[in-house]
UniProtKB/Swiss-Prot annotation:
Record protein name field: Thiazole synthase
UniProt enzyme class: transferase
Location within or outside the cell: Cytoplasm
Catalytic reaction equation(s): [ThiS sulfur-carrier protein]-C-terminal-Gly-aminoethanethioate + 2-iminoacetate + 1-deoxy-D-xylulose 5-phosphate = [ThiS sulfur-carrier protein]-C-terminal Gly-Gly + 2-[(2R,5Z)-2-carboxy-4-methylthiazol-5(2H)-ylidene]ethyl phosphate + 2 H2O + H(+)
InterPro entries: Aldolase_TIM (IPR013785), Thiazole_synthase_ThiG (IPR033983), ThiG (IPR008867)
Originating species: Mycobacterium tuberculosis (strain ATCC 25618 / H37Rv)
Keyword Transmembrane annotated: no
BP GO terms, sorted: thiamine biosynthetic process; thiamine diphosphate biosynthetic process
Protein residues bound to 1-deoxy-D-xylulose 5-phosphate: G159, A185, G186, A207, S208
Subunit composition and interactions: Homotetramer. Forms heterodimers with either ThiH or ThiS.
Catalytic-site annotation from UniProt: K98
Pathway connected to this protein: Cofactor biosynthesis; thiamine diphosphate biosynthesis
Gene Ontology MF annotations: thiazole synthase activity
Originating gene: thiG
Amino acid sequence: MAESKLVIGDRSFASRLIMGTGGATNLAVLEQALIASGTELTTVAIRRVDADGGTGLLDLLNRLGITPLPNTAGSRSAAEAVLTAQLAREALNTNWVKLEVIADERTLWPDAVELVRAAEQLVDDGFVVLPYTTDDPVLARRLEDTGCAAVMPLGSPIGTGLGIANPHNIEMIVAGARVPVVLDAGIGTASDAALAMELGCDAVLLASAVTRAADPPAMAAAMAAAVTAGYLARCAGRIPKRFWAQASSPAR
């Protein structure tokens, strides 16, 4: 079965694995991991990037042919997130943005009220908005209604590696979405990424699971394989769960 492409807004991607860059020990290891992942879209925190720098992260992404996706990491209000997105548009010449508005540093949980406010303003300003949100199906629908090009619910808090805490919530978001659903945050290992795709997500975004692994390039390759396997399994259709056993070969 041929694997279809991930389509977000007016762009398509062969890979359904979106990478982040936070937590990488150095650019050399990050480069190996990005290559192993096969990703075509990678987030960069605009606050940590010198757009005029010489041999930095942006140069690496450009050399690898990977599209940078600026994010508003660190923003605590809609106003702050909007300003960061506007600066990213000027610096990187892109109207794509991963929107993050965080409530506090301890949980790194999205602030729903400020997130929706920022999304509304950025969509009105012509941005292609990919919001990092909670696993609340109502909030996901609200963000979609504002005109966001995708919704990106968390599996569990950023950097925890706890996997998908509420699989049913993710399924509800998928069932009601008319835009791509990208599982964002909480991935710890390859089975988490496969589960996200089996639940119906269109893509997975992860960073720490690779950058903080003992062997980042090897884990990146594992994540790429897991995302593909989970997607193909979802498309193929799993067998129904049964209470009693059923012989695979008939007795007669």
